[in-house]
């Protein structure tokens, strides 16, 4: 059986915490921020925990857990 490979697009968008939770990051922070408030831009920098129903699927995309 061949090695499991990491889905690179997923590795850039999500991460698995030390306790096994799956975190993602909010979109809309990279460019075109002139009309947004500072609170909005800072709020988009924080990650959030995905729903438990999605954890198993995301962990298949990241077999090494990174």
UniProtKB/Swiss-Prot annotation:
Swiss-Prot/TrEMBL GO biological process terms: translation
Organism: Deinococcus deserti (strain DSM 17065 / CIP 109153 / LMG 22923 / VCD115)
Domain of life: Bacteria
Family: Belongs to the bacterial ribosomal protein bL35 family.
One Gene Ontology MF term: structural constituent of ribosome
Protein name (Swiss-Prot/TrEMBL): Large ribosomal subunit protein bL35
PANTHER family reported in the protein's UniProt record: 54S RIBOSOMAL PROTEIN BL35M, LARGE RIBOSOMAL SUBUNIT PROTEIN BL35M
HAMAP family: Ribosomal_bL35 (MF_00514)
Keywords: Ribonucleoprotein, Ribosomal protein
PROSITE patterns named in the record: RIBOSOMAL_L35
Gene Ontology CC: cytosolic large ribosomal subunit
InterPro entries: Ribosomal_bL35, Ribosomal_bL35-like, Ribosomal_bL35_CS, Ribosomal_bL35_sf
NCBIfam families, sorted: rpmI_bact (TIGR00001)
């Amino acid at each position: 059986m061949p090695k499991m490979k990491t889905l690179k697009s997923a590795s850039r968008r999500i991460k698995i915490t030390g306790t096994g939770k799956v975190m993602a990051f909010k979109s809309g922070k990279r460019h075109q921020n002139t009309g947004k408030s500072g609170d909005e831009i800072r709020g988009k920098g924080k990650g959030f925990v995905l729903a438990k129903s999605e954890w198993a699927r995301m962990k298949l995309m990241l077999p090494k857990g990174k």
